[in-house]
Each structure stands twice: as structure tokens, then as C-alpha cells.
């Protein structure tokens, strides 16, 4: 924050001797003689105008202006007078005030943050991209002050904000590239201007993709949105990123994870209203099967299945030499089957229903073996049983004449069919659509409605569906069921907590406990429900515990509203026992 004193401008070591300036002035005169130089009087006037502006001595361009002024024959006395008279010492005053604050006991770091944040807000408010570009052009090279600024997190953050606000500013675009060159590309994912420069974008893409892969499933929810937003910045960024991920997806090691990320990005684009289906098909194997590609593309673009295109695919996938199964393993395409086959009230042409079921079952169950880009075998062992399970559950789910009591009689059949992953996904979607109806819980008399009981079975059989089950339970838990009275709402929420505890018992521990911890911290959940959850969890767990679990769960028990309020039977006190076990076996991190 220190600034230069006025007298420093005449330092001979910095500017060179008067003779050197004179030589340069002669050179300038020769340039004038050739008709290419500027008029000396105009140059002097322009320079004097700059010298008369406030604190011009602090400007980075002061040295070049002085040089031009003296080359044009300007008088040193005028310079000294103007610079001195217009020196108001804004920077030095800030330094002085900062020193006073520190002397009064304010932490130096806090003072620095205050000054920097105020300066950032002023720069964002008054930034002029045209002026920035002109200064940048005049410099002719990367200014030293810019290289110094990008070395600091605070000022990099400023450049990111400015670049978002002024995407066409050349100076900011260049600065973003400089930041990327300096190795900070991991910070640039949210900067849209980075998407305009291939070199920067490819570097940021590589870093972001590596971060997502290293972070694994548990960090996907945190890392993916920013990445998807960057990739979906424009058609060019989407195509480039998906093409690169398509190549990486062919790798034996980590290829499937990259394919998953590519599919999540495609879903993000679809949710934002972009139709990227043609790019998806072009990068897959569809290009070799133009008729199938046309049928798929039509349905994906419209967001709905239709009998004509389904018939085309059905004929191809029941032929002696069907296309690769990968062709129909497009998540957006499979989602359309969920809506057609499992959504309550969905109408499907009975003459074509078997075709819909066959294609979905084929995509879900057929296993192909490939060697050197050539298919050597197709295993259809599970195709028939999968088709049968899909058809059975479809008939149960979409039969509007079957109420909850009739479904109870079919529970054993449903449980058998749920063992097939594709059916479990369909049932999960069906349960979501059904229980999201406003009057659903109002009409239920059972303590545990059959639809929620099905979620327990899905949690038991399919670890990969745990996140979706929890997502549904959280949605229901946070929904305001105003049609129920207060006691009925509490009972319903206890039932939902029972489902969460079951999910925890099936191995999905940290996400469930994390959610309840957030409920406690946000103070928006009836404390009796938190106590109920704690009691139920303590009933199903036993040592040894992982450190991550203890770090999440112990603070819930130690909360003033929880500790000492849970009733115990006899001498057995699970809360005290758990706390004592943790204190003696773990070091808690605040």
C-alpha cells in the first residue's frame, strides 16, 4: 500500500542523465523533420494536462509522459510545480489511516482486507473497458504491475468478476490467459471469457475434469455444476468438451467415470433447454446407423417416444445383427421410457407396448464383448426375465384401478421384480410421482404407506440408487403437508425418518447424517424429530465407528437440545455410552 513520494520523480538513477534525455529529444526532432513526429507544442500541452490531474505522479504512465514532455522541449519547473500542486496523496493517506487502525488494535490482516475489498468494489463500479484497452495498447507489452497483481488471490478474484461483467474487454481476456499461464486455471471455471480462448479453455477443462475424477462420487454434487456450466457456455465449448470426453471414455482405466460425467453434462444442457441430442449421437456409434440415428434424434429432440420411431428401433434390435447396445444407452432416452412405462396415467398404445418394453430391457440387460472395435459376442441371457419384470411392474403401476390395498397383495411380486435395477429405477420414479400428489398422504391410513415401504426394498437391493432415494425422502420431509394436522405431519415425518435410518443401515451413512446435522443447524426442524432420529440410529449402530461418522454424529448428541433429553429405559443410556466411547477413542476436530 506504500506509494512514491513526489521528489522521487526526478531520481537521475531511474531516468538517466540529462544528456541522455537530450539525445532522445534530438532523435524526436529528427522524427519531426521527417514529417512523422508530433508538434512539440501539442505534445507539451497534452503532457501538461495530464500533469495537472490529481495524483498523476502515482500513475504507472508517469515515466513515459515525462519522457515525451522533455523530448518535446518541456520545462522541468512546470513539471515540478504541477505534480506538486496536484499531489493529494490518496494512497499515502490510506496507508496512514491503515497504520492508525493497526495502532488502535485492529488486526493487520483485517485492515488489509478492508482496504482491498473497498478498492475492489470501486474498481468494479468505475471500470471502463475502453480505457483499460487503450492503456494496455499504449504499454506495448505486459505491464509489470499486472503480473504483480495476478500473483495475489484478491486481485485474481477481481479480474474474474470484471471479466464476467466485460467479456469483450481485450485487456481482461489477456489477463485471464495470463492467470491460466501462471498455473491458476483451476480458479477459472466460472469465467465465461475463458471459454473464448481455446488454449485457456482446454487447460481449464483438463484441470476441472481431473478434479471431478479425483473427487469421486461423494464430491460430484459439489464439483459438477460449475464444470457443466462452463462446458455449456456455448455450442463450441460443448462440442469440444464432449468430443474430448468421448475419446477419454474409450480408455479401460477411468473411461466409465468420464462417460458418466459426459452424460451428467448432457443432462445439465437438456435441463437448461438446449437440444444437444445430435452431438451426443454423432459422438457415439449412431453415425454408423443413420436410420437408428434419425429415429433416436427425433424422439430426443421432441422429448417423447412415439410408436413409429420405436418400431424402427425394435426391428433393428430384434434382427440377427443388431446395432451396438451403446446406441440406446443414452440417459435422456432411457428417461423417456420411465415416463412412458411407469408414470401414473401414462397412455401407451397396447399394440406397441411390447416394443417399448423390449427396447428398455435390451438396453438394461444385454452384455456385449468387444475386441479391437469388433463385437465378438452378445449375451442376452437376462433379456427375457428383465422384459417380464418390466411388463409385470408396468401393469401394476399404471393400473389406475389398483389402490394401495390391492398393491399390498402384490408386494411379494413387486419385491421380486425390484431386484432388476431397471425396474427399481422405474418403481422409484413411480413412487416419486405418486407420493408427490398433494392428496396422497391425506388419503393414507397405514402408518407406513406401501409406496414408502417399496423405497426400503430399493435401498436394500440397489446401492447405486441410494442418492435418489435420499433425494426423494428429503423432498417429502421438507414439503409442507398443510392438508394434515400438526400431529399427522409429525407422524409422517417420523415415518420418513424411519426410511432414512433404513437407508443409513444399508450403508448410506454420511449423507443421511449430514442432512440431519444441517436440519439441526438451520433450526427449521422440530427438535423432537431430531431426538427421534438419534434414538433410532443409536438403536441400530455399534462400534467400531469411523472418524467421519463420529465427527458428524457426535455434535448432534452433544447439542443442548438433545443431550439429556432422550428418555432411557433402566440403567442403559445409549447417548451417554456413545459419547463416552467417542471421547475415549477419537480426537474431535472443531
Curated annotation (Swiss-Prot):
GO terms for cellular component: NELF complex. Residues 21-43 have a biased composition (Acidic residues). It is found in: Nucleus. Keywords: Nucleus, Repressor, RNA-binding, Transcription, Transcription regulation. It comes from the Eukaryota. The NELF complex is composed of NELFA, NELFB, NELFCD and NELFE; NELFA and NELFCD form a stable subcomplex that binds primarily through NELFCD to the N-terminus of NELFB. Binds RNA which may help to stabilize the NELF complex on nucleic acid. In vitro, the NELFA:NELFCD subcomplex binds to ssDNA and ssRNA in a sequence- and structure-dependent manner. Interacts with ARAF1. Interacts with PCF11. Interacts with NELFB. Interacts with KAT8. Belongs to the NELF-D family. This is Negative elongation factor D. It comes from Pongo abelii. The lineage of its organism: Eukaryota, Metazoa, Chordata, Craniata, Vertebrata.
